[in-house]
Amino acid sequence: MARYTGPKTKIARKFGEAIFGDDKSFEKRNYPPGQHGNNRRRGKKSEYAIQLMEKQKAKYTYGILERQFRNMFEKATRAQGITGEVLLQLCESRLDNVVYRMGVAPSRRAARQLVGHRHITVNGELVNIPSYHLKAGDVVGVREKSKSLAVVQESLSNNSSVYEWISWNSEKKEGTFVAVPGRVQIPENINEQFIVELYSK
């Protein structure tokens, strides 16, 4: 499956929540997409359908393809800790996600573009791999000649989110990935246990 690049609101309506962040269009039409979406009754889903839906929600939320997501799950099963929580922690530790969490980009999709176009550094070195996994203490910054980019300045000026596991220096336009977040520090509405059950079949 290729990475989805279509209308975000349509996907958000599929899951019944604004999984990509603030979405005024979703607020106006928070019912399933389709001709009869506003009047359609949501039938009772099977256990498999619920588990699959949760996996799809996580993949769309973080913008991760199936092979990458499956590999991350396998890595989570080998790590210490609760598999589902470790999976979400791996998602949160990706460079594109941290760039988004720091407020450098208005969305994960925009964060991936910034990383891919070589606007982001890790510990002073250019890194253009969105899936790069950060370690505690890593410093993520905006490349010097990219600090004046309109998308970066506008995103930072509109950002009001604060996360305990990330620090940010507004003057240097760089932040530190202080620690891997605990489950309670991850705001996404994802039931990771359903994903574990699906992959464990």
Swiss-Prot record:
Protein name stated in the entry: Small ribosomal subunit protein uS4
Summary of the function given for this chain in its UniProt record: One of the primary rRNA binding proteins, it binds directly to 16S rRNA where it nucleates assembly of the body of the 30S subunit.
NCBIfam families: PRK05327.1, rpsD_bact
Summary of subunit composition and partner proteins: Part of the 30S ribosomal subunit. Contacts protein S5. The interaction surface between S4 and S5 is involved in control of translational fidelity.
GO CC list: small ribosomal subunit
S4 RNA-binding domain ranges (all copies): 93-153
Record region (Disordered): 26-45
Alphabetical UniProt keywords: Ribonucleoprotein, Ribosomal protein, RNA-binding, rRNA-binding
Domain of life: Bacteria
Record Gene3D superfamilies: Ribosomal Protein S4 Delta 41, Chain A, domain 1, RNA-binding S4 domain
Cross-referenced SMART domains: Ribosomal_S4 (SM01390), S4 (SM00363)
The family this protein is said to belong to: Belongs to the universal ribosomal protein uS4 family.
GO molecular function: rRNA binding; structural constituent of ribosome
Gene Ontology biological-process entries: ribosomal small subunit biogenesis; translation
Keyword RNA-binding: yes
Cited CDD domains: S4
